[in-house]
C-alpha cells in the first residue's frame, strides 16, 4: 500500500502479509488451549514453532512499523500534527467499525455493554480494545514517542540501543517487583518498544544486512531454535510439564526485535525489486489489506477452524491445520479488500502531506551521522 508520501515498497508488504499470516494461524490452531491443535504439541521442525507461537506476528508488525517510518521520514522534516492526523485517518475508521460490530455481537448475545464500553474507554491507555485493537493502542503510544525517538537517532545513530537497554531494565524491575512481567512485555509498549526501536536502528544500518544470506540464515535458525525451546517449555500459555522461566519475558521482546529487525533490513535491501510470481503477489495483496485482515479475522477464524474440523476433515494434526490455515488466510484476502475499499480507503484520501524537504531541517547536517542522511535503498 502506498504511503501518504506516495512511496511504495512491495517487499515490506510481503513482510506485513507474513505477520498477518502468523497471527491468523495462531488463532486458527488454538481456538482454545485444547484445539483444534492441542497447545501442548511441539513441531518436530523448529521453524514451525514460530507458526505454533504465531502471536509473535504482532512483534513483527511492530518492528516493521519502526523500520518503515524511519525509511519514510529519513532526512526529512516532519510536521507532526498532520502526521498524527494521518495516523488517525489510517487506524481509527476500521477500529471504530470493529468496536461497533463487537458491541452488536455482545448485545445479541445478551452480554453487559456497560463493561464493554468501559473497556473501550480504557483502551486509550490499556490493552482492552477488542479483536486485536489493543495493538493499535501500543502503536499510538509509539507514535507519541516517535518525534523524540527520531530526533535522538538522528543525533546519535545508536540511540535506539540505549532506549532498548532502558526498556530491558524497566522490565527487569517489574519482574523483581511483581515476580512476572509477561503482561507488560506482550500487551504494552513496555515490551514492544524494543521492536519499534530495533526497526528504526535496522533502517539506519541496513547496508550491513544487504546480501548477507548466511547471516540471515543463521539468525533464522537461531530464532527458530529459541522458539522451539520456548514452545516446548509451555509457550505463551505456560502449558506442558515444563514451563519457561517467567524472567524470559524480560528478554523475549528484545530477541524478537533483533531477529525481526535484521530480517526486515535483509529482505528490504536484498529483494527490493518487485516480484510478480503468484506467491509473492498473494503476499503483497495480503500485506496491503493486512490491517483489515488482522482486526476482522477474530470474528470468524475460530468458527472456520471448527467448521472444517466438524464437517470436512480432522485438523488436529498440526501440519494439516497449518495447510488449512494457509488456504483460509488466502480466502480471507477478498474480505480484507472489501473492508479496505469500503472502510479504510475513503478516509485515506483525506490524508495530508506531513514532510517537507530536508533543506528545511532545523538540525544541522554536521550534527548527524552520515548514515542517518542517506536516502532509502
Specify the residue positions occupied by each region the protein language model found.
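Loop-to-transmembrane-helix entry motif
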Residues: 87, 91, 95, 289-296
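Hydrophobic, membrane-inserted alpha-helices
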Residues: 142-148
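Alpha-helical transmembrane segments in multi-pass integral membrane proteins
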Residues: 1-11, 21, 25-52, 70-82, ...
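Divalent metal-coordination and catalytic microenvironments
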Residues: 16, 66, 88, 139, ...
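Extended basic-aromatic, gly/pro-enriched interface segments that bind polyanionic ligands
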Residues: 54-56, 60
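Membrane-interface helix-loop-helix regions
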Residues: 40-53, 85, 91-141, 166-189, ...
Amino acid at each position: 500500500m502506498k504511503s501518504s508520501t506516495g512511496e511504495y515498497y512491495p517487499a515490506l508488504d510481503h513482510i506485513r502479509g507474513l505477520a498477518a499470516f502468523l497471527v491468523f494461524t495462531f488463532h486458527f490452531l488454538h481456538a482454545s488451549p485444547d484445539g483444534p491443535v492441542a497447545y501442548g504439541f511441539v513441531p518436530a521442525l523448529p521453524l514451525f514453532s514460530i507458526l505454533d507461537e504465531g502471536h509473535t506476528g504482532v512483534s513483527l508488525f511492530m518492528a516493521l512499523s519502526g523500520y518503515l517510518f524511519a525509511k519514510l521520514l529519513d532526512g526529512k522534516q516532519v510536521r507532526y500534527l498532520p502526521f498524527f492526523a494521518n495516523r488517525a485517518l489510517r487506524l481509527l475508521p476500521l477500529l471504530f467499525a470493529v468496536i461497533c460490530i463487537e458491541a452488536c455481537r455482545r448485545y445479541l448475545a445478551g452480554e453487559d455493554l456497560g463493561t464493554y464500553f468501559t473497556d473501550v474507554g480504557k483502551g486509550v491507555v490499556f490493552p482492552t480494545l477488542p479483536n486485536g485493537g489493543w495493538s493499535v493502542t501500543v502503536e499510538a503510544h509509539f507514535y507519541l514517542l516517535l518525534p523524540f525517538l527520531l530526533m535522538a537517532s538522528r543525533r546519535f545513530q545508536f540511540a535506539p540501543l540505549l532506549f532498548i537497554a532502558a526498556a530491558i531494565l524497566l522490565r527487569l524491575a517489574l519482574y523483581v517487583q511483581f515476580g512476572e512481567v509477561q503482561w507488560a512485555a506482550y500487551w504494552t509498549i513496555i515490551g514492544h518498544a524494543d521492536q519499534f526501536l530495533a526497526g528504526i536502528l535496522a533502517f539506519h544500518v541496513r547496508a550491513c544486512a544487504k546480501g548477507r544470506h548466511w547471516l540471515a540464515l543463521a539468525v533464522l535458525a537461531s530464532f527458530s531454535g529459541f522458539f522451539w525451546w520456548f514452545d516446548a517449555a509451555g509457550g505463551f500459555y505456560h502449558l506442558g510439564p515444563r514451563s519457561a522461566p517467567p524472567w524470559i519475558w524480560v528478554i523475549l521482546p528484545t530477541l524478537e526485535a533483533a531477529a525481526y529487525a535484521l530480517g526486515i533490513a535483509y529482505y528490504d535491501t536484498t529483494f527490493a525489486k518487485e516480484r510478480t510470481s503468484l506467491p509473492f503477489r498473494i503476499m503483497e495483496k495480503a500485506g496491503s489489506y493486512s490491517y483489515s485482515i488482522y482486526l476482522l479475522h477474530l470474528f470468524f477464524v475460530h468458527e472456520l477452524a471448527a467448521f472444517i474440523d466438524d464437517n470436512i476433515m480432522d485438523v488436529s494434526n498440526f501440519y494439516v491445520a497449518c495447510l488449512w490455515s494457509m488456504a483460509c488466510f488466502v480466502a480471507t484476502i477478498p474480505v480484507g479488500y472489501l473492508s479496505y475499499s469500503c472502510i479504510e480507503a475513503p478516509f485515506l484520501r483525506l490524508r495530508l502531506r506531513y514532510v517537507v524537504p530536508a533543506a528545511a531541517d532545523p538540525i544541522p547536517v554536521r550534527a548527524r551521522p552520515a548514515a542517518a542522511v542517506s536516502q532509502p535503498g
